[in-house]
Amino acid sequence: MAPVSGSRSPVREASGGKRRSSSRSPKSIKSSRSPRCRRSRSRSCSRFGDRNGLSHSLSGFSQSSRNQSYRSRSRSRSRERPSAQRSAPFASSSSSAYYGGYSRPYGGDKPWPSLLDKEREESLRQKRLSERERIGELGAPEVWGLSPKNPEPDSDEHTPVEDEEPKKSTTSASSSEDDKKKKRKSSRSKERAKKKRKKKSSKRKHKKYSEDSDSDSESDTDSSDEDSKRRAKKAKKKEKKKKRRGKKYKKKKSKKNRKESSDSSSKESQEEFLENPWKDRSKTEEPSDLIGPEAPKTLASQDDKPLNYGHALLPGEGAAMAEYVKAGKRIPRRGEIGLTSEEIASFECSGYVMSGSRHRRMEAVRLRKENQIYSADEKRALASFNQEERRKRENKILASFREMVYRKTKGKDDK
């Protein structure tokens, strides 16, 4: 062990340490400067040296030279020995082996190569994360290429016919608005012209009236009568004019409302056409609740009507059921004729059942029939009661009829 360690020079070991250190990443350099990392690495180096038959002095010296060589080559050469002295308290076994010539094994937690690998993996992972974030924000045009600023319209969504139709509709709407404005302007100008004419006519009338008053100044009584007549005529004319104006205004309003309604209906039809241009307009839409094609209309025959499962008792059925009730047996249903009630009960216990809807219907019929069963005395009492009621009704009707006949005949006799 000792002669092998003595044969190598510390300068060569330092140079070897420099070469090894040049292949490392910069993050591992910073982490190796901490005292804990130095401690663990010195321990791992000592173990590694023992396994390969090398002394602890070489490993300690190489570790110190590695730590210092990352700063600069010029500084590392001058500070090799002091750095070895600094690392001596943390790796006492390595320094004692170098100066004293004996070695003492010191157990470390983990070998330093595994820590370096972890640090490298961490740095690579951080780089990948940052690259992914950058690509997510900016994109990668060299891989995917830039997306088009104005995407081309899809052939299915935008057809040239559909693109032309909205243009036509907009032009038609604008033209209709212009026509409305022109009509309003023309109506206003007409009203102004009418007002001017009325003013002129009123002025002329005033002039004529003044001339007449000058000429007829001698006869005041005649002029006063004429004035009153004229005033009455003027008032009548004004009333007539007002009525005419009101009628004209109403007509104009009705015309405008009609035009607006027609315009709104045309706009709605245009919007509907834009929504679905392929819809058939010739056929009027009829609200139908049914969805899908209509079933062929066939005349309902008597065979198609639902079967009546016997609401009333058949002849002789009531007596047979009464016998079953007296015996305390189950009344057989109509669908179960041919079997005894005991057989039917055994079948039902073993799990044989009728179809659900038929079973329910039959059960209801059975219960109703059980309620319909009366004894002989009850039947007699009911028959007598019914006969009495019928006689009373008949007597009332006959009496009322006799009274009516008597009145009619009595009236004829009196005449």
Curated annotation (Swiss-Prot):
Chain residue ranges for the region called Disordered: 1-309
Gene coding for it: Nkap
Biased composition range(s): Basic residues: 33-44, 181-208, 230-258
Self-association and partners: Component of the Notch corepressor complex. Interacts with CIR1 and HDAC3.
Protein name per UniProt: NF-kappa-B-activating protein
Cell compartment(s), UniProt: Nucleus
Record keyword Phosphoprotein present: yes
Compositional bias segments (type: Basic and acidic residues): 116-136, 156-168, 259-270, 277-286
Reported function: Acts as a transcriptional repressor. Plays a role as a transcriptional corepressor of the Notch-mediated signaling required for T-cell development. Also involved in the TNF and IL-1 induced NF-kappa-B activation. Associates with chromatin at the Notch-regulated SKP2 promoter.
Gene Ontology terms, MF aspect: chromatin binding; chromatin DNA binding
Composition-biased stretches (Low complexity): 23-32, 54-71, 84-108
Family, per entry: Belongs to the NKAP family.
Keyword entries, A-Z: Acetylation, Isopeptide bond, Notch signaling pathway, Nucleus, Phosphoprotein, Repressor, Transcription, Transcription regulation, Ubl conjugation
A single Gene Ontology CC term: nucleus
Region (Necessary for interaction with CIR1): 177-272
Organism: Rattus norvegicus
Biased composition (Acidic residues): 212-225
Chain intervals for the UniProt region annotation (Necessary for interaction with HDAC3 and transcriptional repression): 273-415
